[in-house]
A protein has these predicted regions:
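A glycine-rich helix N-cap at a beta->alpha junction
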Residues: 1, 69-94, 270-271, 275, ...
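GST superfamily/GST-like fold recognition
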Residues: 30, 51-63
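Conserved coil-to-alpha-helix start sites within the AMP-binding
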Residues: 31-40, 196-197
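Short hydrophobic alpha-helices that are characteristic scaffold elements of the AMP-binding
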Residues: 47-48
Length: 475
């Protein structure tokens, strides 16, 4: 910045023009927007003359106004650094550094009404169907190369155990050997409330969901501590919290509805609401991957959501609810018995059909479960590994597999929860957990602890020498 020949500060004056000035009176924000468009014109003109323009964003607006002696009422729209450059890169530096990727136009264009996705001149497309179409199995060529490389690395065959399986999976998923190291990573915590809470299945009041969302955003939860330890981003998404949450930096407001209905008296959700929540998960996966993340982790928050998880797992494992319904937040025997009875009552009432995954979610699922289904499908369609957390993620994975069986190519079981339903889900999915610490918290905590293990599995493929390159004699 200091070496740039010319620095330009562009401001907008919101006090200019009276109520008859077109655009200013009814839409005050048009003033800085118009100034930003003027900056774009300047940028294009400078580029045509061989000049580079850097748009600086790391400054405090009020501090800059005072430092430059600007009138206090001015809004700083842009701080630009202008000068000749040695050469222009083929693509923006943010993309080169992996900080940002250009999104396909089809991701963001809606026709006539929001949610009706269509490019000009093309028929509308369904986001879920489009996503499922792009989910493919592991690449056989890269998978074979990974196993061959494992044989040549300076270690006894099979010495790295599960890490060898994970590294081969990452290779097949990415179609590359060695595979990309899955960093940076982001944990997506979907928050939603449950109408079945009214049946007395947990000792915690429903407002704890919103309070914990605030805790996540304030950096005070266990998931924040673990994320800080492993260098992961925490992304919090309100997909169905019962109350209105204040606008807070870091919170993505994607509420489909204010909590589910009581699944013992009727469907928890409509089919349309299920699809909307799945789309929230798909779009979250797309946004996080477009932002440069190489791995996605599942997280959730919702008081009473283990009741819905037990119902989903019972449906997809064909297991007695008594065997897959756990104690969640540590309920006593009496409440545990009631919780089992509630799950049985809901399943008897709805008789959900496993062949209709949307219908199963509508009957007994949660908004965060549906959103996690979308995250898994979205991650798999982008060939990005998704590390699963606990019992709720296991339930979501069962539903996602019913929608698109090849989704499991992208799934890695981060840990085994203390919840009995999680064991049943993992067995049905055929996934082996990487960590077993009797965790039963959720929030993505188990997935976060597993992240360094997954990253290590990829790193050894890059950094461990082969017998030939190291000059080590084989057995």
């Amino acid at each position: 910045i200091l070496d740039t020949p010319v620095n330009i500060v562009v401001t907008a004056d919101p006090t200019r023009g009276g109520r008859h000035t077109l655009g200013r009176h009814t839409q005050p924000q048009m003033a800085p927007y118009s100034s930003a468009l003027a900056v774009e014109n300047l940028w294009l003109a400078a580029r045509a003359e061989g000049l580079g323009v850097g748009w600086v964003s790391f400054f405090d607006e009020r501090e800059m106004v005072r430092a430059l002696g600007l009138p206090e009422h001015l809004e700083v729209v842009a701080y630009l650094c202008v000068g000749y450059v040695d050469e222009f890169p083929d693509e923006p530096e943010l993309m080169q550094a992996g900080w940002s990727k250009r999104r396909p136009l089809s991701w963001v264009v809606h026709e006539e009404t929001y949610g009706r996705r269509a490019l000009p001149g093309e028929d509308p497309h369904d986001l879920l169907a489009e996503t499922v179409t792009n989910i493919r199995p592991l690449d056989a060529k890269a998978l074979g190369e990974a196993w061959e490389r494992q044989k040549r690395m300076t270690k006894p065959p099979g010495a790295l155990g599960m890490l060898e399986i994970i590294s081969a999976q990452l290779s097949g998923l990415s179609r590359m050997c060695p595979p990309p190291i899955p960093e940076p990573a982001a944990v997506a915590i979907f928050a939603g409330d449950h109408g079945v809470h009214a049946q007395g299945v947990t000792a915690w009041p429903q407002e704890v969901t919103a309070q914990m969302v605030a805790n996540f955003l304030g950096g005070g939860a266990v998931c924040n501590a673990f994320a800080n330890q492993v260098g992961a981003e925490v992304c919090v998404i309100d997909v169905g919290v019962a109350c209105e949450l204040p606008a807070t930096p870091g919170l993505l407001p994607r509420k489909v509805r204010a909590g589910t209905a009581d699944m013992t008296t009727g469907p928890a959700l409509t089919r349309e609401e299920v699809k909307a929540a799945i789309e929230v998960g798909i779009e979250t996966a797309r946004d996080l991957v477009a932002a440069g993340n190489k791995a996605l982790l599942t997280g959730e928050m919702g008081i009473a959501n283990t009741t819905a998880s037990a119902a989903l797992i019972s449906v997809y494992t064909d297991t007695d609810p008594a065997e897959v319904t756990g104690r969640g937040t540590g309920i006593n025997d009496e409440m545990h018995t009631r919780k089992i009875e509630v799950v049985c009552r809901a399943l008897d009432f709805h008789q959900p059909d496993p062949a209709d995954p949307i219908g199963v979610l509508a009957a007994v699922g949660g908004l965060e479960h549906a959103a996690m289904v979308g995250l898994l499908l979205g991650g798999a369609s982008l060939r990005t590994p998704v590390i699963l957390d606990g019992v709720s993620a296991g339930a979501a994975a069962l539903v996602a597999r019913a929608i698109a069986p090849e989704v499991l190519a992208a799934c890695i079981a981060g840990h085994r929860s203390a919840e009995p339903g999680h064991v049943a889900a993992l067995n049905k999915l055929g996934l082996r957990p990487l960590v077993d610490l009797d965790l039963r918290l959720g929030e993505g905590t188990g997935a976060l602890l597993a992240l360094p293990v997954v990253q290590s599995a990829a790193r050894v493929m890059h950094e461990v020498a082969t017998f030939d390159s190291a000059g080590v004699t084989e057995k």
